[in-house]
Design a protein with these regions (language model features):
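Second-shell loop/turn segments in exported
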Residues: 88-92, 192-198, 332-335
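Di-metal (Zn2+ and/or Mg2+/Mn2+) metal-binding site signature of metallo-dependent hydrolases
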Residues: 92-100
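A short, Lys/Arg-enriched amphipathic alpha-helix followed by its capping loop at the start of a domain
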Residues: 101-114
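Proline/glycine-enriched tight loop/beta-turn segments at coil->beta junctions
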Residues: 77-84
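Active-site neighborhood of phospho(di)ester-bond hydrolases with catalytic His/Asp-centered motifs
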Residues: 87-89, 119-121, 222, 261-263
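Active-site/substrate-binding loop(s) of hydrolase catalytic cores
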Residues: 96-97, 112-251
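C-terminal accessory segments enriched in acidic
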Residues: 2-60, 66-74, 133, 200-207, ...
Length: 395
């Protein structure tokens, strides 16, 4: 009879290899997992004393409830009724001055008459990741005059792919049936007016459209940035209903030394906030663009300094050859110039609406203007934050 071989007895150290391997793998993965989780955390704000409530977009479209796109709607109201304004910041999360300008507005706004709604970040999902192959920094810090800093996220132009996967081969805009490339399905400024059963990005656009309708918003201001070589830059884009209002605002800005062009909203290019909100609602819909090298195609190294300073050697070379559409000074186009333009633009638009339509007038104060921001810096109008302020519900 063949003798049965006894199984070889493993040495003691063999029994602990798997637990040790798993422990080492877990320790290596923990920092990445921690950073991944942190990407879902929003920046912290300190709204002014004129804040009366904070809602969420899900209150205008329940489909966004319990999703990363369910961002806050900050409501500032005076003691007297008046016009209603909606400011969108962070529609494109890779355009930092549009986002920061909305934060500066909500942290400094004083209002006696009327109501101002601020949706920031408009595309919250887009701030949970940066854009592939763009080498954007994850964050940038704005120094405060008394010491310390405020840190803000840099995001992607598009909704996070995790909230919109997979992209179709072709994006068919609703309801125009305009055809765009597939990844534009995650571009919030190609999704208006949105639809309740569409993609996550279309649902965000739908919620904003419903906000405009339900709250009877008189004026929508969408804050953006564009590359210096882009044709529509340092511009105020307006729906035709807002033509007189936009023209008066640009005249006011010109008296402050701000060179800004007027651009009519194209009627055959759909999905844009100014086009679709103007068509789908009675509001005056406008969009402002400032020049930002971070979103340009000609830039070099893209780091936090470039976000803040806007000073790039390749753009200086391009400017000398006439390849850019705006003046590009020796010190670049820093954050304070870009944010300052937006702040003066917001004030000019609100004032223009009150002059042309007195029943829609607002009485506001506290908003820093272009010269103030350029002279003192953006940090002078941001608060040092140590804890997250408690949310207040609308009364």
């Amino acid at each position: 009879m063949d003798q049965v071989e006894k199984p070889t007895r493993l040495p003691w150290w063999a029994w602990i290899r798997l637990p040790v391997f798993l422990a080492i793998a877990g320790a290596m993965m923990y920092p990445a997992a921690r950073d991944f989780r942190r990407q879902a955390e929003h920046d912290v704000f300190a709204p002014s004393s004129s804040l009366v409530g904070i809602r969420r977009l899900s209150e205008y479209h329940s489909g966004l409830l319990m999703t990363p796109c369910n961002t806050e709607v900050y409501i500032f109201r005076g003691n007297e009724p008046g016009g209603k304004v909606l400011v969108l910041g962070g529609t494109h999360p890779n355009e930092p001055a549009g986002y920061v300008a909305a934060v500066v507005l909500m942290e400094n706004l004083k209002i006696r008459k009327g109501t101002v709604f601020v949706v920031v970040p408009s595309n919250a999902s887009g701030f949970s990741a940066t854009e592939p192959q763009e080498a954007y920094p994850e964050t940038y810090r704005i120094p405060l005059p008394g010491g310390g800093y405020r840190q803000f996220r840099m995001g992607s132009r598009f909704t996070n792919v995790l909230d919109g996967w997979p992209d179709p081969d072709v994006y068919l805009h609703y309801p125009s049936r305009q055809i765009l490339s597939g990844n534009e399905t995650r571009n919030l400024n190609r999704a208006f007016p949105g639809r309740p059963d569409g993609s996550r990005t279309e649902q965000v656009a739908y919620a904003i459209t419903q906000l405009v309708l339900r709250e009877r918003i008189d004026l929508v201001i969408d804050l953006h940035e564009a590359s210096p070589e882009y044709p529509v830059v340092n511009a105020l884009v307006f729906h035709e209903r807002a033509q007189d209002l936009a023209a008066l605002a640009t005249l006011t800005m010109s008296t402050e030394g701000i060179d800004i062009s007027l651009e009519p909203s194209p009627q055959n290019f759909h999905g844009l906030s100014h086009r679709e909100l103007g068509d789908a609602t009675p509001t005056f819909a406008v969009l402002m663009e400032t020049a930002c090298v971070v979103v340009g195609r000609l830039r070099g190294r893209t780091d936090a300094d470039l976000v803040l300073l806007g000073n790039d050697p390749y753009y200086h070379a391009a400017a000398r050859r006439g390849y850019v559409r705006v003046p590009y000074p020796e010190n670049g186009i820093p954050m304070e110039v870009r944010v300052g333009r937006h702040m003066s633009g917001i004030t000019a638009l609100i004032d223009a609406m009150g002059q042309l339509y007195p029943e829609k007038g607002l009485e506001i104060s506290g908003i820093p203007q272009f010269k103030d921001v350029v002279e003192k810096g953006v940090g002078a109008y941001l608060h040092l934050i140590s804890v997250r302020p408690r949310e207040k519900r609308q009364e």
